[in-house]
Each structure stands twice: as structure tokens, then as C-alpha cells.
Regions:
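PLP-dependent class I/II
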Residues: 1-158
């Protein structure tokens, strides 16, 4: 709130890929006073499995969208018409497949996290959404490799 001239760009591409009862919340929902200076970006690649289709969208104050449109129209061609039609169909069509895909992603997440946490010196927190994990190798620092070298840092670990 200290810097009202600063715009906030919120990438909400993973909003539908959440697990274990976690609910996605936008920044503007958490702090409504930020609504008028928040640009929310999203796309079709993650939840709708349309990677490579290059379909995205954003919500922002009208005057900013107008300026963004002027800039975009001068430097980037449009998304293919078939991709646009597919995106509209995906957004307006049945959404039950998202839950099925999330169950598959959750199963994979649980397996990866479990296996990482079984590895000596590795720890990994369970992510609440998306499909990325961020394991820590801190528990290996100071240990020896099978070749007898001491692991001094993350680069030695790799």
C-alpha cells in the first residue's frame, strides 16, 4: 500500500491446479485495495492442457488494457483462430476433466515427494499446487560422495 504507483502483475496460470483442499486466492481478493492496480494474467496451457497453443488472457483496468492492446498490436501477431476457438470451447465446456487431471498430478506429486524424502540427505516439502517440487539437498552438505569427495555446497551435490 506504500507505493500506489506500482502495478502488480499476478500470474494465475496454476489457479485450477491445487490439491488437498487448498483454495486458490487472488491477490486482489486478499487485499481489495490492490484491485485497481493489479494485472491478472492467465492462460490455457496448464489447466486445459493446451501447451503450445499460445492462448493467454489478462484482466486489468480498462485504460491499461487499452494501452497494452496498442503495444501488442504493433509487435505480435494474433493467436491462430483455431486456438482461440478451442480456448473458448475449453472455458465454456465441461470442467470435470480438470478434477481428473488434478488427481493424476496429485498422485504423481505424492510419488515424487515421497521418493525424494526417502533419499539420504534430501528433503522436499509437499507443494499445494502446480506440478513443481523444490527439493533441498542441505542434508547432504558435509557428507561424502560414493567416490569419497566431501560435498561442500549445492554445486558439489549436482
Amino acid at each position: 500500500m506504500k507505493h500506489p504507483h506500482v502495478w502488480i502483475f499476478s500470474d494465475d496460470i496454476y489457479e485450477k491446479l491445487v490439491y488437498d483442499g487448498f483454495e486458490f486466492t487472488t491477490l486482489a481478493q486478499v487485499e481489495p485495495r490492490l484491485y485497481d492496480r493489479t494485472v491478472t494474467m492467465n492462460g490455457m496451457s496448464k489447466a486445459y492442457c493446451m501447451t503450445g497453443w499460445r492462448v493467454g488472457y489478462c484482466g486489468a483496468p480498462k485504460e491499461l488494457v487499452k494501452a497494452m492492446t496498442m503495444i501488442q498490436s504493433q509487435g505480435i501477431t494474433h493467436t491462430a483462430a483455431i486456438s482461440q476457438a478451442a480456448a473458448v470451447a475449453a472455458l465454456n465446456g465441461p470442467q470435470d476433466f480438470i478434477e481428473k487431471n488434478n488427481a493424476i498430478f496429485k498422485e504423481r506429486r505424492d510419488l515424487v515427494v515421497s521418493m525424494l524424502n526417502q533419499a539420504n540427505g534430501i528433503s522436499c516439502a509437499t507443494p499445494e499446487g502446480a506440478f513443481y517440487v523444490y527439493p533441498s539437498c542441505a542434508g547432504t552438505i558435509g557428507k561424502k560422495t560414493p567416490g569419497g569427495q566431501i560435498i561442500k555446497n549445492d554445486e558439489d551435490f549436482v
